[in-house]
Amino acid sequence: MIQLKYPLFWLLSGWSFVIAVIFVSVSPIVEFAVFNVNWEDKILHVVTYFLLMIWFSGLYKRRHQVGVAVFVMALGFFLEMIQLRLPYRYFEPADLVANGIGVLAGLGLSLWLLAGWCQRIEGRLRYHA
């Protein structure tokens, strides 16, 4: 993990996001139709796993980003396997693909630009305080 002034804040926020993803993934499905689009669920998967990847990329140096991506992908795979066993949820291979797209997009952005972003935010907050 990179040197942060408020590591507990960043970690607890990130793990709260993970817990929320786990909770939503194992809860009974709530039907929602915001845009009445068939791919809405897949877009939600891409965005969720993209944001998870970006969040945790802010906590670790660039050389650890692939490990972060493996963790986030493993989380998505694990949750899909749990859904396979739940009577009120269902497994969909396209969800794994959407998760992977989100993680890879987040990995690309973190390797290119955003790795360690938490440290840069803390630096700017100290400068303006």
Which residues does each predicted region cover?
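Membrane-proximal cytoplasmic C-terminal regulatory module of class A 7TM GPCRs
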Residues: 112-129
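Membrane-interfacial alpha-helical segments at the cytosolic side of multi-pass membrane proteins
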Residues: 47-62, 103-113
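Residue-level recognition of membrane-helix boundary sites in multi-pass small-molecule transporters
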Residues: 12, 64-68, 90, 95
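Short helix-capping/hinge motifs at transmembrane helix termini and TM-loop junctions
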Residues: 26-28, 60-61, 87-88, 114
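Membrane-embedded catalytic cores of phosphoryl/pyrophosphoryl-handling enzymes
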Residues: 52, 60-79, 83
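"…centered on the first transmembrane helix and the immediately adjacent amphipathic helix/loop
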Residues: 1-56, 68, 72, 128
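Interfacial helix-loop-helix junctions of multi-pass membrane proteins
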Residues: 31-40, 79-104
